């Protein structure tokens, strides 16, 4: 069963952080790539710390071994300097899919006792 094996590695491009540049009076979109570097199919889900300001499309999915997906991370307009942005980040969570499962994302993969890995990408806002 897939859940007894820890999920393998993923890669993200960019690797360490996401940067948005001013002005912030309009919506910005930044693309990141998530690559399944492992030898197993994974399910992934993306979380944000600020759902009012940050969005990700698609927010979840399934990746075969060595497959990649391009995600659009959007930042809605906001009053820079008047809102707390220090803890803004997106988190990629991923887990192995059960053997024989269809290539369709299922939230319950993350709710059982299988291992879930996480990678945080902090968001930096340049004035």
From Swiss-Prot:
Other facts: Around 30 MSP isoforms may exist in C.elegans.
Cell compartment(s), UniProt: Cell projection, Pseudopodium; Cytoplasm, Cytoskeleton
Organism name: Caenorhabditis elegans
Domain (MSP) ranges: 9-126
Physiological role: Central component in molecular interactions underlying sperm crawling. Forms an extensive filament system that extends from sperm villipoda, along the leading edge of the pseudopod.
Keyword Cytoplasm: yes
The name this protein goes by in its record: Major sperm protein 10/36/56/76
TM annotation in the entry: none
Family matches, as PANTHER family: MAJOR SPERM PROTEIN (PTHR22920), MSP DOMAIN-CONTAINING PROTEIN-RELATED (PTHR22920:SF7)
Gene: msp-10
GO cellular component terms, A-Z: cytoplasm; cytoskeleton; pseudopodium
Sites of N-acetylalanine modification: 2
């Amino acid at each position: 069963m897939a859940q007894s094996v820890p999920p393998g590695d993923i890669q993200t491009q960019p690797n360490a952080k996401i940067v948005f540049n001013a002005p912030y009076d309009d919506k910005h979109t930044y693309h990141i790539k998530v690559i399944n570097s492992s030898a197993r199919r994974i399910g992934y889900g993306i979380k944000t710390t600020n759902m009012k300001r940050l969005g990700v499309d698609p927010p979840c999915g399934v990746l075969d071994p060595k497959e990649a997906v391009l995600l659009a991370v959007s930042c809605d307009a906001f009053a820079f300097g008047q809102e707390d942005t220090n803890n803004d980040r997106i988190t990629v969570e991923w887990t192995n899919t059960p053997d024989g499962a269809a290539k369709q994302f299922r939230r319950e993969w993350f709710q059982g006792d299988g291992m879930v890995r996480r990678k945080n990408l902090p968001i930096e806002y340049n004035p």
